[in-house]
């Protein structure tokens, strides 16, 4: 979902469009509950919760829903929030690799549904570690260009810990260590620069370019996985050219 990937750019646009869907809201709420359970209800002392809440607010989750999720997760309502994080690894078309991040209250259900979605859509489950080494955990901020140059963005965020700024065509993507993400957001705010999304993601060290057929199959696989309630995120090293993107959009 990162780098100069056409899939990444499409995904971030899709995330904004889909932000009002109930499924998207449920996943954001689940993130908040887990972060509050792990680190407590205080945003100032819980960076994971602060990130989860910021993301939820950015995608228009109502404040009441957010507050209730924090209280549930922190155990202030008497409800038990018991989710397990699981990462599955898979191979897709033409040598592409996928990491499937799950948050579930039923490990058997998650395993069954993920495996079924992969096998039905042309992928194969990979052994633990055989795919994950291709990715690094990074803070990733996506922002529209709005007339900005790459140097403008870099100057705004360099002292906040930014490692690089990538040009994705219509947008820029800032990479940092996960812990520097709040400082990056604050630096952008101070510079008057608006951003679309900020995430902690698994970023591929190298990308695999797919042709039209491979990209079509890959999108089918990725979409099937993301439709699953237990799947929070899908990361991949798949990429495709402008020509392949245009061909897919014309179908």
UniProtKB/Swiss-Prot annotation:
GO terms for biological process: regulation of DNA-templated transcription. Keywords: Cytoplasm, DNA-binding, Transcription, Transcription regulation. It holds the Pfam family Transcrip_reg. Signal peptide: none annotated. One of its GO terms (molecular function) is DNA binding. One of its GO terms (cellular component) is cytosol. It is found in: Cytoplasm. The keyword Transcription applies. InterPro entries: Integrase-like_N, TACO1_YebC-like_2nd/3rd_dom, TACO1_YebC_N, Transcrip_reg_TACO1-like, Transcrip_reg_TACO1-like_dom3, YebC-like. Its main location: cytoplasm. NCBIfam families: PRK00110.1, PRK12378.1, YebC/PmpR family DNA-binding transcriptional regulator. Belongs to the TACO1 family. This is Probable transcriptional regulatory protein Achl_2034. The lineage of its organism: Bacteria, Bacillati, Actinomycetota, Actinomycetes, Micrococcales.
């Amino acid at each position: 979902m990162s780098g100069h990937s056409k899939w990444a750019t499409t995904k971030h646009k899709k995330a904004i469009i889909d932000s009002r869907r109930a499924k998207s809201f449920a996943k954001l709420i689940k993130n908040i509950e887990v972060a509050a359970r792990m680190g407590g209800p205080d945003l100032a002392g819980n960076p994971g919760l602060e990130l989860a809440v910021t993301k939820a607010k950015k995608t228009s989750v109502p404040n009441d829903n957010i507050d209730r999720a924090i209280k549930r997760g922190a155990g202030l309502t008497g409800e038990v929030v018991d989710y397990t994080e699981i990462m599955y690894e898979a191979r897709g078309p033409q040598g592409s690799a996928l990491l499937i991040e799950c948050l579930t209250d039923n490990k058997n259900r998650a395993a069954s549904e993920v495996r079924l979605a992969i096998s039905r859509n042309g992928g194969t489950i990979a052994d633990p570690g055989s795919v994950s080494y291709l990715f690094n955990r990074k803070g990733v901020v996506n922002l529209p260009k709005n007339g900005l140059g790459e140097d403008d963005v870099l100057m705004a965020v360099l002292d906040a810990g930014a490692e690089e700024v990538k040009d994705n065509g219509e947008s820029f993507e800032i990479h940092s260590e996960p812990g520097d993400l709040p400082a990056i957001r604050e630096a952008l705010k101070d510079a008057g620069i608006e951003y679309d999304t900020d995430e902690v993601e698994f970023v591929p060290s190298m990308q695999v370019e797919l042709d039209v057929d491979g990209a079509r199959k890959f999108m089918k696989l990725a979409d099937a996985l993301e439709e699953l309630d237990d799947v929070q995120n899908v990361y991949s090293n798949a990429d495709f050219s402008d020509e392949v993107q245009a061909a897919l959009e014309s179908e």
